[in-house]
Amino acid sequence: MAGAKEIRSKIASVQNTQKITKAMEMVAASKMRKSQERMAASRPYAETMRSVIGHLALGNLEYKHPYLEERDVKRVGYLVVSTDRGLCGGLNINLFKKLLAEMKGWSEKGVECDLALIGSKAASFFGSVGGKIVAQVTGMGDNPSLSELIGPVKVMLQAYDEGRLDKLYIVNNKFINTMSQEPRIMQLLPLPPAEDGELKKKSWDYLYEPDPKALLDTLLRRYVESQVYQGVVENLASEQAARMVAMKAATDNGGSLIKELQLVYNKARQASITQELTEIVGGASAV
């Protein structure tokens, strides 16, 4: 059994770590609230944009934009959204596992995959496991802006425009609630039709001003940008929620460990006192 002094040192060490994890839990809770506000503010725009674009995909368009047309799939692209920091449980690795499984499925069909990475964890992971990385951006912090995301988005859209990509997806964690975040792979291009069954039964027609091509060229790019930005803010809210939960679990585990060490310390101290008393009694008997 370890000595009482050594056990006291371990208890102090765990208590110090517990203070750190508690502080990190409180910081993550504060950041999560701000991230949720940002996510809630942008979600209606992103969902409305997706709904309008879904109507367009079902519409009788006088100009058929390339983003609306299905192609034979030879190469697909993924915009992968991850965190810049760790200590957020299995948030990143669960997302990467889902993506790797999908990439394996494409590979078995002879389809190649390009990756545009957002966040240092994705850059680190796919840099080690392999994958064709065509763009990456890291270090966006807790308040990302659309201008920081334009680089990877532009690279993937250019590849799609030039026919080097036949499908484009965004990969991110969707924020469900504080305790639940869901890894998601969502198709961006070609434009998926609206999922609502009632909408599919309707025929949509639009009048465009000034002309369909100019409007659709701009609108469809804005659609992709809005979905990527929403994916990033959802992932950020998921990160802070996962970190808060992970740090709370670490703090609680620290408390349990301290109790166990306190028991061991008490037993060690009791054994030490018993030994001292035995030595005193033995010495008195010898006299």
Curated annotation (Swiss-Prot):
Keywords: ATP synthesis, Cell inner membrane, Cell membrane, CF(1), Hydrogen ion transport, Ion transport, Membrane, Transport. The keyword Repeat does not apply. It comes from the Bacteria. It is a peripheral membrane protein. Pfam families: ATP-synt. Its main location: membrane. It is found in: Cell inner membrane. One of its GO terms (biological process) is proton motive force-driven plasma membrane ATP synthesis. One of its GO terms (molecular function) is proton-transporting ATP synthase activity, rotational mechanism. Belongs to the ATPase gamma chain family. Produces ATP from ADP in the presence of a proton gradient across the membrane. The gamma chain is believed to be important in regulating ATPase activity and the flow of protons through the CF(0) complex. F-type ATPases have 2 components, CF(1) - the catalytic core - and CF(0) - the membrane proton channel. CF(1) has five subunits: alpha(3), beta(3), gamma(1), delta(1), epsilon(1). CF(0) has three main subunits: a, b and c. This is ATP synthase gamma chain. The lineage of its organism: Bacteria, Pseudomonadati, Pseudomonadota, Gammaproteobacteria, Enterobacterales.
